[in-house]
Structures are given as structure tokens and as C-alpha cells.
């Protein structure tokens, strides 16, 4: 049983779902229906877990080349590729059935798009072919925002898209920080992550570019959602703290990889704090 849970990458799923509940709260202009929230989060967990399980099947030959991923259940033989594929298919179908029966048609469609996009577009088409893989493939990680919003309203507003772009621009610096830390692993697998194929200077410029757009999108989100001005101030401060982490990432520093690891951890903290802020600001407005 543990092996099948590992296939779903529940720690990654948890991070994805951090943005789902805030999106539902913003869409509902308050607390969403409890049953709807539970159904959306559970179905979203299955959908993301399905995509992750398919990813492990497809990338098992690459995973065995990387120390960080060499203990995954398909690589070790704990679970066969065929069993993992069946599992991924079943929980994916179950997630869509749950979305259809307990949420809205649009949320169901978006969940399907998210699974297909992550598996086909990101994993199969982009990841091993371009250094911009995480930029475009990362769009799948933004889908929980749209799914959560659509589960409440069966529509998408500018506020939903603003939240989408916060996650979209957050994703590259988050994953590039991880790729810096595990650069040798990605190189061994032949995965052209930007830190593997580009200079440190180029990587820093790209991380700054996306961080600035992330901060701008977070301001847009607060304004579009018509949240209190105090929440805008806190949002800007969170963004500036994020940017401050990048200042410490210096091209010639012997601590380069260590600092990148700290940025990766802070990026998770940033997204979690922003999500809590959105919920609190909406409930108090």
C-alpha cells in the first residue's frame, strides 16, 4: 500500500492543493460548502496523484539514473510498470467521476486537462526536449486554482486567472532552485533543466524575471479580488522577502547550491503564507 501512495507523490500533491482551498474561498466570497470543498480536495488529490503515477511510469528509466529518485517504487521493482499504469488510470478515472458528480462540469474538464497536460505535454513532450520545460509544463501545477474556482462557480473570472499566473510565475524559480541543488542528478539523466544547460548568470536572470512577474501577479490578484489594502501590503512584503532570497544567490559563491536549497524551501513557505493570507483576508473583508 505504501508503494502506491509513493506513486502519487503526496507531498507534491499537498503543495498543489494549498492553492485549491483559497481559490474556492475567493470564488465563494467566503467559506464554500463543506461537502463541496471535501469532494474537490479529495478528487483533486486523486487527479494529481494519477498524473504523478503516470509520470513515474514514463520516467522510470530516467529516475534510476538520479540518486534523488532512484528509490521510487517503479524503479526498485516494488510495483511493476503495468500495475502502476493500472493504478494511475483507475484513480484518474475515479477523480473525474467524483468531480462530475460532486462539483461542476467545468471543474471536471479542467481536471482532465490538467492530467493530460502534465502527462503528455510536460512529461512526454517537453521535459527532455527544452530548458523551458518547467515554464510551460508548470502550467499543470496552476490548474488546482482554476479547478477550485470552477468547482464553486462553474466559470472562471479575472481573479481566478490572476491567481493562476501567481502560481505560473512562482513555479520556475521554485523548481530551478531545486534543479540547482540537484544539478548533477539532472545532468546524469540527460534532463535539460535550465541550471544544467545554461550559465549561472542566465539562470539568475530568468529567476529574477519570473519572481518580478510573480509579485506583480500577486498584486493583481489582491486588487482583482477586492481584498483589503492591508492584505496588499502583506502580499508585497512576502514578495520582497522572496526576492531577498534571490539576492543571496550569487553567481560565484561557494554556497550557491546551498542557498538555492534555501530558496526552494522558502518558495514553499511563500506559497503557503500567501494562501493563508488570501483566506483570512477574504473572510475578514
Predicted features along the sequence, with ranges:
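Intramembrane alpha-helical segments
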Residues: 81-152
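Cytosolic, membrane-interface loops and tails of multi-pass inner-membrane proteins
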Residues: 1, 58-79, 176-203
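Hydrophobic alpha-helical transmembrane segments in multi-pass integral membrane proteins
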Residues: 146-156, 214-221, 270-285
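Transmembrane alpha-helical segments that form the membrane-embedded catalytic/substrate-channel core
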Residues: 46-54, 116-123, 165-183, 215, ...
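Small-residue-rich segments of transmembrane alpha-helices in multi-pass membrane proteins
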Residues: 18-21, 72-73, 135-152, 201-202, ...
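Multi-pass membrane catalytic core of lipid/isoprenoid biosynthesis enzymes
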Residues: 68-109, 199-223
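Membrane-embedded alpha-helical segments that form the functional core of polytopic membrane enzymes
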Residues: 18-60, 68, 97, 109-120, ...
Amino acid at each position: 500500500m505504501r508503494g502506491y501512495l509513493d506513486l502519487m507523490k503526496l507531498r507534491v500533491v499537498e503543495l498543489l492543493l494549498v492553492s485549491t482551498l483559497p481559490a474556492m474561498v475567493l470564488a465563494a466570497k467566503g467559506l464554500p460548502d463543506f461537502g463541496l470543498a471535501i469532494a474537490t480536495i479529495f478528487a483533486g488529490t486523486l487527479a494529481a496523484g494519477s498524473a504523478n503515477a503516470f509520470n513515474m511510469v514514463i520516467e522510470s528509466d530516467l529516475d534510476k539514473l538520479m540518486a534523488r529518485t532512484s528509490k521510487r517504487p517503479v524503479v526498485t521493482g516494488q510495483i511493476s510498470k503495468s500495475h502502476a499504469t493500472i493504478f494511475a488510470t483507475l484513480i484518474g478515472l475515479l477523480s473525474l467521476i467524483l468531480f462530475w458528480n460532486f462539483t461542476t462540469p467545468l471543474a471536471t474538464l479542467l481536471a482532465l486537462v490538467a492530467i493530460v497536460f502534465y502527462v503528455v505535454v510536460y512529461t512526454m513532450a517537453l521535459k527532455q526536449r527544452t530548458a523551458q520545460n518547467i515554464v510551460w509544463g508548470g502550467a499543470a501545477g496552476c490548474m488546482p486554482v482554476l479547478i477550485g474556482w470552477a468547482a464553486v462557480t462553474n466559470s472562471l473570472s479575472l481573479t481566478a486567472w490572476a491567481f493562476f499566473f501567481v502560481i505560473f510565475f512562482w513555479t520556475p524559480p521554485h523548481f530551478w532552485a531545486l534543479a540547482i541543488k540537484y544539478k548533477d542528478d539532472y545532468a546524469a539523466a540527460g534532463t535539460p533543466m535550465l541550471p544544467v544547460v545554461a550559465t549561472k548568470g542566465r539562470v539568475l536572470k530568468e529567476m529574477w524575471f519570473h519572481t518580478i512577474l510573480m509579485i506583480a501577479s500577486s498584486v493583481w490578484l489582491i486588487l482583482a479580488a477586492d481584498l483589503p489594502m492591508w492584505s496588499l501590503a502583506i502580499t508585497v512584503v512576502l514578495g520582497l522577502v522572496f526576492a531577498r532570497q534571490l539576492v543571496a544567490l550569487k553567481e560565484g559563491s561557494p554556497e550557491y547550491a546551498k542557498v538555492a536549497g534555501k530558496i526552494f524551501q522558502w518558495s514553499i513557505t511563500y506559497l503557503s503564507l500567501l494562501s493563508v493570507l488570501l483566506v483570512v483576508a477574504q473572510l475578514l473583508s
